[in-house]
Amino acid sequence: MKKHLLALGLLLVGVSPAQALDVGDISSFMNSGSSTLSKTIKNSTDSGRLINIHLERLSSPLDGGQVIPMDKPDEVLLTPASLLLPAQASDVIRFFYKGPADDKERYYRIVWFDQALSDAQRDNANRSAVATASARIGTILVVAPRQVNYRFQYANGSLTNTGNATLRILAYGPCLKAADGKECKENYYLMPGKSRRFTQVDTANKKGRVALWQGEQFVPVK
């Protein structure tokens, strides 16, 4: 599974070591100009899987984030919420944002319950086996503000997000430490109000480059 984590630690519920369901990126972003998002999931095993999906709103995607009420019952819709996924098959799950069109960034945890189809069909006498053959996977959905305001400050190798939407920031160029090699690259997600210092790339070097993504727009910084 690709793991593009939010900076400072992404809240993630337990994932089985022998994960059968591939849900793609751990962090998914719905930009301000879009109200829909699609995620492709894949069953990489040789048996069918029963997949159930539900979504809950978080105060923050970072460690310590709490589940909080939705602003409205149909704030985010998804389809399908339950499906049978055959062996080595894939399917697309679609999410629809119907929430407030304001200046707040919103965070949601998508919880994927993955269960072997053979276990789901067993009778009550054998139901204890279901827990060991099931996985509960958590991924993050970030919905950018509908009234987005991208702003940032950069100084001395440190970027601060002074806007209201998460930025994807990157630096590349000569390594700061010789032990790291000649060329280094750093990528992070930077939430509103947070700062990040680049520690591997020598950003003071004239060949060092700093840039960021504002939604789908690439912005050179240095």
UniProtKB/Swiss-Prot annotation:
Pfam annotation, one family: EcpB_C
Keyword annotations: Chaperone, Fimbrium biogenesis, Signal
Induction note: Positively regulated by EcpR.
Cleaved signal peptide residues: 1-20
UniProt entry tagged with the keyword Ion transport: no
Family: Belongs to the EcpB/EcpE family.
Name of the protein in its database record: Probable fimbrial chaperone EcpB
Organism (species): Klebsiella pneumoniae (strain 342)
UniProt gene name: ecpB
